[in-house]
Every structure is written in C-alpha cells, then in structure tokens.
Amino acid sequence: MAATPESKVKKRIKEILTKFGAYYAMPIGTSFGNSGVPDFLCCVKGRFLAIEAKAGKGKTTALQDKHLCSIHTAGGMAVIVNEDTLDSLEKLLASI
C-alpha cells in the first residue's frame, strides 16, 4: 500500500520527535473514542505538546480546532504541522 501524503508528514514528525528525545503517543480514532484529538500527544522536557498533522493545504475540522484551543487554554502547546512547517516544529522543539 502506498503511503499517503499525511502519513509521510506523520513519519517525519516521528523522526523529529525522536531526535529531540520527546515522548509521544498517537491516539487511534475509533467510533468509541474522542473524535478530534490531535494526532500526536507529546511531552518534551516536561512540556505538553499536541500536534495535528496535515498534508498539503489540508484544514483542521471544527472539532480538531476545539481540542487544540482547549489544550492552549489548559496551558499546553498545540500546533498544526504540514510539509512546509516541519522546520518550524524542529525550531519549536529546540526552543523548549
């Protein structure tokens, strides 16, 4: 099976998180789960970081936006990453 554009972004995010020694989990969405939860839930040097992966010009859903906003409100960091912003993720992790 060929890798989807989003799966390629997720693969690169995993590589970056590993490079920085981050803990991460990737919740699996199911009909019984909590829809809209970000693709990656991470702990980087004691800081909570959620990452929503998108490919190309993919947009977040209203439910994903709600989760990202709730994470910010609770004091965590939440970012959306695509192919063009992988370098920004590395810079963010380096700054923590």
PLM feature segments, named:
Residues 1-96:
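Catalytic phosphate/metal-binding cores of nucleic-acid and nucleotide-processing enzymes, i.e., regions
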